[in-house]
Amino acid sequence: MEVRSESNITQARSDKLPLPPAVPKPRVQVWFVRVCSSILVWTCLVQLFAAGELWHSRIFTGLTNQISRFSAPVEPVPLPPPLPPPRNYTSNGILLVSCNGGLNQMRSAICDMVTVARLLNLTLVVPELDKTSFWADPSGFEDIFDVRHFIDSLRDEVRILRRLPKRFSRKYGYQMFEMPPVSWSDEKYYLKQVLPLFSKHKVVHFNRTDTRLANNGLPLSLQWLRCRVNFQGLKFTPQLEALGSKLVRILQQRGPFVALHLRYEMDMLAFSGCTHGCTEEEAEELKKMRYTYPWWREKEIVSEERRAQGLCPLTPEEVALVLKALGFEKNTQIYIAAGEIYGSEHRLSVLREAFPRIVKKEMLLESAELQQFQNHSSQMAALDFMVSVASNTFIPTYDGNMAKVVEGHRRYLGYKKTILLDRKRLVELLDLHHNKTLTWDQFAVAVKEAHERRAGAPTHRRVISDKPKEEDYFYANPQECLCEGTNCHDLFGHRNLTH
């Protein structure tokens, strides 16, 4: 039997007894710090609210706005407009087109080719742009226009492919039928002579597209489609749109501005044979250039005869006198919507002296912003197009493609002021003033009288049935698209449209 000592029993009992409670000194200290901190924080908050009430602290207001913003319901992001349903039709073939000329000539041609494709129930391939003309611009359609928008926005009219299917390409041995459509052709020509070609060839390539559709005599639905493509289907790329908008914004911040389409560029002078104001060396240089391009048909041109007929662009010196005579003041802001002026800044000196606030895109934008568009004349022309359309007043010094297309666009936007210079009359007046026959006051009065009805107001297109090249261009005045319904007499008045 095991015997335990008293001391051992006492030790065992003492191990089972609870220890007396210790004083929690660290916990008291923690609670004390917390109470003091709370008092301090509440004091600061009270002071902050008081300061906000007294001085409307922007910091506190911003904080409140942030809280409200996060607590308020989130506004849904607006969805893009729904796409029109695709038109369901049996395609008669594929139309491939190669546009020729500068940006605005190609723009009009694209509108015409979409319309032809719709008329003939064809599938259109996104048009190829001119890369071999004087400007040698390598830009493709996708470098200038928003391809996705072009295809989607017109899909209820025409089926458009990004590229020609491989089986129809020359690379795979397909012999494509090429042709230039007859200029100024009507609906009957395309239905009777062009449509049968697709039954035989499936793919037809139009290798020239300038002015291949008549100005007049087409069904109203086709004229409307030409306008729809021009005003809605053809959007510039987001990059071009952004830079063009920035240019317009800079100009508008400086006040109203005139967009002057000063078509005094080397290619135009060489093509037209207009050398008034040029030195003998410059005239010879322009003549040599004219002979360099075989597709420029006229070679021997008498400059002064051409000028007297009103067929030459005004010189910068002549423009200075005309603008002053029209009443534009010296502080008028003028944007030069053009490429390189022939003779450079030297030829602009008189115009700049008369109107010191002359600017160009190169003066308004950083060189880095323009760098990606340099050596791409069509992309630079797109910037000038956007500025010209947005200007308070547009004045072209020559009636080329840009002048005409911008004029029509400004009519579509509500007949914005566009001064269409009567160059034939102006040449007469300028010469009379130059030889002292007319005083300045007489000259100014005569210039204003000559342009009272040439500011872009509503009017009918002039129709010359047997001379379509001499009649008013559809895209300069798309009158069918500028009034509601099919009857435009209320807008234009009752007039005979032909002569």
Swiss-Prot record:
> How does it sit in the bilayer?
Single-pass type II membrane protein
Record's catalysed reaction(s): alpha-D-galacturonosyl-[(1->2)-alpha-L-rhamnosyl-(1->4)-alpha-D-galacturonosyl](n) + UDP-beta-L-rhamnose = [(1->2)-alpha-L-rhamnosyl-(1->4)-alpha-D-galacturonosyl](n+1) + UDP + H(+)
Which residue ranges does UniProt annotate as crossing the membrane?
31-50
Residues in the signal sequence: none
What GO molecular function terms would the record report?
glycosyltransferase activity
Q: Which UniProt keywords apply?
A: Carbohydrate metabolism, Cell wall biogenesis/degradation, Fucose metabolism, Glycoprotein, Glycosyltransferase, Golgi apparatus, Membrane, Signal-anchor, Transferase, Transmembrane, Transmembrane helix
Q: Which InterPro entries match?
A: FucosylTrfase_pln, GDP-Fuc_O-FucTrfase
Q: What is its EC number?
A: 2.4.1.351
> Glycosylation positions?
N88, N121, N207, N375, N435, N496
* Annotated compartments: Golgi apparatus membrane
> Its annotated pathway?
Glycan metabolism; pectin biosynthesis
Give binding positions for substrate.
H261, L262, R263
GO cellular component terms, alphabetically, are: Golgi membrane
**Gene3D superfamilies in the record:** 3.40.50.11350
Q: Name one GO biological process term.
A: pectin biosynthetic process
Keyword hit for Glycosyltransferase: yes
UniProt KW Secreted keyword: no
Highest rank taxon of the organism: Eukaryota
Functional description taken from the UniProt entry: Glycosyltransferase involved in the formation of rhamnogalacturonan I (RG-I) oligosaccharides in the seed coat mucilage, which is a specialized cell wall with abundant RG-I. Transfers the rhamnose residue from UDP-beta-L-rhamnose to RG-I oligosaccharides.
UniProt record similarity statement: Belongs to the glycosyltransferase GT106 family.
Q: What is this protein called?
A: Rhamnogalacturonan I rhamnosyltransferase 1
Organism (species): Arabidopsis thaliana
